[in-house]
Amino acid sequence: MEKITVTLGERSYPITIAAGLFNDPASFKPLKAGDQVMLVTNQTLAPLYLDSLRAVLEHGGIKVDQVILPDGEQYKSLSVMEQVFSALLEKPHGRDTTLVALGGGVVGDLTGFAAACYQRGVRFIQVPTTLLSQVDSSVGGKTAVNHPLGKNMIGAFYQPASVVVDLNCLKTLPPRELASGLAEVIKYGIILDAAFFDWLENNIDALLALDMSALAYCIRRCCELKADVVAADEREESGARALLNLGHTYGHAIEAEMGYGVWLHGEAVAAGMVMAAQTSRRLGQLSVSDVERIKKLLLRAGLPVCGPKEMAPESYLPHMMRDKKVLAGELRLVLPTAIGKSEIRGGVAHDMVLASIADCRP
């Protein structure tokens, strides 16, 4: 069992990583006998895990209600979040309730935002079931829903009480979803840790084969890296946390333009990271050899290195200008300067951004 702490003073919380955590109600601390829970999941995961997890929690003396949401990025919306509020109010649940988010990034982000809003804030626990949510979205307290004009535009910084990562969930993950999660894994190596990027080059096949030892190390290292960044810059005030958005400015444009769910988040981020790498190369920062290393590893992970053929470079910019890193109308980009190093760069000419996107057209 691996344990990591996200250090945020009185709001610090543990991340627990192991296979079989769902079998023990003690895994879900700070829950205790007598507590009331609203378990939030989706229609895909409910048949796989809901009954067994509910039984384990009830065996621990916890009172459990549930709400099952539709599955997909297109349902990460205010209207779907209202279903959670309705379920809470119908029972009813008070301020002493705990929301448990059983699912990937959509369920986790939506449930976390619902917890931040319900009666001005109730406790919630992240139980991520996808690789992407285990290494990224469940950690750090970013909660949100989408708007038709932009991804994650309505949300709050709201930290969970704990994160419970059961590696066995990855055994039921479709290969496309596994690859999507690997995009965020590779991101950590590009922006923060050259040695981890080297490790990924040597172990990507083991991760794709669901080698539990490799997965445990991979998830732990990603969570360590993110926990350190979140502890230093919880609300993206110093710029350190914004580095975690490598590829996202371009990638969110793909998701919004194509329609949420057509491209998985990790697929869009993968293409976006190559676009960012090409931008950095054009600025004379990133070497051609490092661009090729990034592309090669993404391809080995089963990820795209080009944007959608339907999207002209010019169609990216309106979405990119709605990015949360834009300041005073100036586009600011996270760019890799070498494997393991990155920076936030403002003032990049739009023509150069468009040329870099064109570099990545199929």
Curated annotation (Swiss-Prot):
Pathway: Metabolic intermediate biosynthesis; chorismate biosynthesis; chorismate from D-erythrose 4-phosphate and phosphoenolpyruvate: step 2/7. Signal peptide: none annotated. One of its GO terms (cellular component) is cytoplasm. HAMAP family: DHQ_synthase. Its EC number is 4.2.3.4. Disulfide bonds: none annotated. GO terms for molecular function: 3-dehydroquinate synthase activity; metal ion binding; nucleotide binding. Keywords: Amino-acid biosynthesis, Aromatic amino acid biosynthesis, Cobalt, Cytoplasm, Lyase, Metal-binding, NAD, Nucleotide-binding, Zinc. It comes from the Bacteria. Coiled coil: none annotated. The keyword Nucleotide-binding applies. InterPro entries: Dehydroquinate_synthase, DHQ_synth_AroB, DHQ_synth_fam, DHQS/DOIS_N, DHQS_C. It is found in: Cytoplasm. This is 3-dehydroquinate synthase.
